[in-house]
């Protein structure tokens, strides 16, 4: 052991150093300053250090700004800062809650403020409190002056104040008003026995005993060895009557010869007394400490042993260096600290959930109590009313009766009263109610007999026949029919007491819903009841018992917290020592592990036990949460049932009230019984009205008072004629007997049949619909309820005179006949197996089916407004739905004409047509099911429809597995929409819609469509109903389908990979996902399109004809006719027909040999004036996929032509902007996708309607209409040989060009959006995204720019032939391996390059409205770009002036200047690349431009690796925008923008920004029209000169972090954001960002600016730090 002492000391020293040093040790090296925000790095002796932060900053690196510098906590809350996270939380004072303590709780401490005179109120419980008074005041509420301050009580007594008077509570032995007098106990004889002497002491006395006695009263004999006076193991031996001897143990290592030491003690009466008392006190003091000291000794031994073992191992291993295990120790400490923080956060989260459930349970409990009390009062009132009417049936003077008719009316009134009693009674007394009913019928028949005869027969009737009854509340019971199912409630009534029980048991099911509560009936009593009360209990966990259980659990768990923490600390220390010992033993090869095997196993068992205890604790807390959730669910269900019963009772009481009011106004008043009968009937009406008040909510008291006043007036005027009474009679409720039954919401007011309602449906796994929650309750997540489906929600008001729609049941397997009547605003939603209702109101639903054998659909429709001006014969019939889920039979579909019909099929069932846009979300997550979800909202449609424009809805016939030829539409549709799924034929729909579909298994293909926010204002002339296409297709055989042969107006067609696609007549949006090898699909997405068109007669273009065989790749039969606004998009393996409107889609092909295409276009507004004979001919397409033959391309001229090729086939030209997303995930395929949305273009033409003569047309051509139809480009391309394509030679108007990585790109004539993904080494792609652009331009003559010419070879990277001509609003975007032209308008794209040698970029610009007035001769010339990718030469950059120029480079090409905000997202996933992503949307800019104000764009010169000083801006720009990545310089930007950037490898840094919804409206002098030169000169003199602020200049080198050259000029709202390695200028608008870094050695940051405060958050080595700057206004 002595040899181990030095090693032990070294080991203890190493442990101390490890524990003393920070978990994340800093190193203050030369040239490396880890501390930020002017923090000082202080070095320890061990070489590590820490950051000493200045005031206002905190964190390990001083990276966080002190969040508590400005206390945001309200109402006395305390701000608590978390140094490591840089966040702050508010510790609220009692009575307040919320994130900032902004909400107060309804507690007396904050409502009434009971503590007076500055006292502090403390909450003890929910309703109790305690006041802490200030000095000088006392009392329960600090209402009394503290008299104890001036009157001190002596001798340790307690002073209390009562009513401003003091009182001293004296200790034992003192007396007096202030306890100043000592009581002499020795004056009372008998205290000391056996001759003992009493001595008086202050507050007590003492007995001096004679020799031989001891004790407090000298009442015991003295025995020397009785109390073991010998210590340290000595043995006591009595030597005399009053003496004893101690034999002590031998002393270790003693040199003396004495082996036994004895000590004789002689104890007198003083010494024995004192020794005895000392021994007892020491024994009592030390006895509780013995177990604790033993446990401490065991722990110390264990730690000492582990330390010795570590020291021994370290001593034996001489060559081992402790620096090698430093990283391991740090890693272990980080894991332990992280584990501790996660556990603490989890405990806090669970505690917060428990608190929320407690509050919810208490609130529901209060509401239950109120409802029970209201039911009890209503029960008493109905019983009193029943007794009163029974008295009327047995009058004392039968000769004064009104006759048989009055008796029958009174019997009817009694029957209604009895029905009311049944509504509020249990269900198992129905037999007695039937006996009572028969008995009362007999009374009615025998009412004319003498009273004695009736009394003799009444004796046979049970006494409780009218007071005790039970019914079952069903859907169709009572005067108000209800279509909502609800549970039966059994209530028992006993005499003069409240004793009603609700028995709850738990169903046992095969799924996880074992705690679903079912309410079972309880047999009611049979004894008579004269007083009825009702109290409903919510189950074994509800009520005060649940609150008590919560408090008990809280009190039990609280003391265990400190003990668990201490155990955790001890275990952590042991675990660290064990890991260190194991590591040292592992490094020593010569050490035999068998010697410490038992110790290591023991430590591992302890660690596992700790984890098991933690898991058990978590399971316990989870069980508590689950119980609370079950309790909340049960209370919600019970509340729903009580509200339903209240509603039914209220309806019945209203019916009874109306009946009795009719008795008060008889047709023959002369036959009345007189004033006494009228008074009795008035009393009955008063009781009925009182019943209505008892069963109605508080907010209906005013209505009830009106009815009561009306009854009183009727009693006073009962003798008047009926006509006079009718003249003054008030209007009674019209919905007495015809009131529709709807679902009650939180407010319990009366409802009429036209009010919207909400219904929530819950379905459980592997079961059908088990239960239904009626009413809008609190949205609490319940783990046992898997699916919650809100079925109907609407805020609109229904028009009058609309009958209810009959419900539809879809659970039957056979076909059903559906309604044929006409609906004006009909909605149909299919849900299998639940029921489907067709209602007149919009509603919302969400359905989730998570098992194999369930297929459902949910539809969500809300908040639509439809204003229509209808002509004659515009009634449309609703759709009929016929569907067999498993048998896949052909359904019976629509045969009638619908106005604006909507249809969406799912994968395994046919979809009915609905007459309004709607929204839904559907999820199918198992193998063999396919579903569909549709989402659409906020559509406003204002249309004026002429006569005879009722389009017929399509007919659908499809068998899912057999794929037979369906019977499709043969009639004409107006604005028809069609979308097929992968496995069945798609019906046509007549309005745009939106949906999202997910199919996640091998053998299914589906489709989802999404579209919302479409406003369409159209005026359609007569005879413009286009015929919808006919579809014939077999999925597997790929036969030649029968396509359209007729003319369509605005036809749309989109094929999928495995079936033929029908044509649709309106833009739409969808998203499709196919995740297996042998499937190809298509998804389309389009929303927010506003189109203002006026179409002349006879302009219906013919739709294209399609001929296609999927596998054989034969030559298809393509279009031969002329189309107006034609759109064409091919997929990877089939030819694409032409489309007549922009659309959007997204397709995913995840295997080697498949390609697809997806387009996305939304929010386009186009106002065009078309002349006659301007229908451009559509392109002809000839293509063979595998052989890559030269296709026959366009030879004709097109107006507004758009062309986009895919990587493996030629693309025809399209005439409208569109967008797509393409994904090719294997080595040898390249694709791209485009997306264009929200473009509003309003052109102005010469004349909008009518035909013009030839002379007028010739004159119009002379004025500027000639040569405006630009020819579309010709495309020639071979994929593998990489030949030079034949590109454009002609001039185009509004031309747009986008190349892909492996082929040449044709020019297009409109902005667009795309997203491209290429995931292999040798491919490069491009993605562009643009939406929501509104452009209002006035273009003068001779402004048709010519489109650029493009020549490119991908692999050789030859210098391309770039633009030589001037373009007006030109758009061009290259990929990373080809040259980038300049663009003159904002656009957006998303690009992904995932391999080593490629770099891409992406842009996104949305919702930009630009109002410009362009003068003559303002056509800017587009820049010329010359670039070689690998050689990194100096490119030839812009030399000309551009108006609104936009350009964004990737990591390997030069960045032109930008003139407008844009957004993009870029992903670079390898080691040596950096990227940039920006996002800007919803910017409105109103500008007025003078002549010759086109700002020149900046010139940029950049070499990526060498980081050369670029040539930055020297000119003045008007609202210029530029954003560099981390490896290039950043120009200045003048508008807010947003982006998202992801860098996923070791040595890269990125950032992301997001700014949205900024509206900027400039003010100018004049918006439209020309001004003379004199006026323009005068305007410049008045202050219009020099208003274009120059953008800032930025100069920075990435690695060296030098001081950049910042702004020198004045800016007007300029925005600039650099990455982490260069300086940040000031910004004047708030923005936000999120950054993700996924490796250990990365540094990332996120920015957040709000209210002149800028926060920079940086994450490095699993740490997060922030810094902030406050900007001046």
Curated annotation (Swiss-Prot):
Q: Which cysteines are joined by disulfide bonds?
A: 28-41, 35-51, 53-62, 68-79, 73-90, 92-101, 109-121, 115-131, 133-142, 148-159, 153-168, 170-179, 186-198, 192-207, 209-218, 225-236, 230-246
Query: What is a single cellular component term in the Gene Ontology annotation?
Result: cytoplasm
Subcellular location(s) of the protein: Cytoplasm
Output the Gene3D superfamilies linked to this UniProt entry.
Laminin
Q: Which domain of life is it from?
A: Eukaryota
Disordered: region residues: 423-463, 713-734, 782-828, 1242-1280, 1561-1594
Ordered alphabetically, the record's keywords are: Calcium, Coiled coil, Cytoplasm, Disulfide bond, EGF-like domain, Repeat
Enumerate the InterPro entries for this protein: EGF-like_Ca-bd_dom, EGF-like_CS, EGF-like_dom, EGF-type_Asp/Asn_hydroxyl_site, EGF_Ca-bd_CS, NBPF, NOTCH1_EGF-like, Olduvai_dom
Please give the chief subcellular localization of this protein: cytoplasm
**Boundaries of each Olduvai domain copy?**
427-521, 698-790, 791-879, 882-937, 938-1029, 1032-1104, 1107-1162, 1163-1255, 1256-1348, 1351-1423, 1426-1481, 1482-1574, 1575-1673
Coiled-coil features, chain-numbered ranges: 337-381
Query: Is ATP-binding a UniProt keyword of this protein?
Result: no
Q: Where is the composition biased (Basic residues)?
A: 1243-1261, 1562-1580
Identify the residues that the record assigns to the EGF-like domain, covering every copy: 24-63, 64-102, 105-143, 144-180, 182-219, 221-258
Question: Listed GO molecular functions?
Answer: calcium ion binding
Q: Where is the composition biased (Basic and acidic residues)?
A: 452-463
Compositionally biased, Acidic residues: which spans? 427-443, 792-801, 812-824
Please provide an example of a Pfam family that matches this protein in its UniProt record. Answer: EGF
Q: What else is known?
A: Encoded by one of the numerous copies of NBPF genes clustered in the p36, p12 and q21 region of the chromosome 1.
Family statement drawn from the similarity comment of this UniProt entry = Belongs to the NBPF family.
Protein name, entry field: NBPF family member NBPF26
What is the species listed in this Swiss-Prot or TrEMBL entry?
A: Homo sapiens (Human)
Lineage per the UniProt record: Eukaryota, Metazoa, Chordata, Craniata, Vertebrata
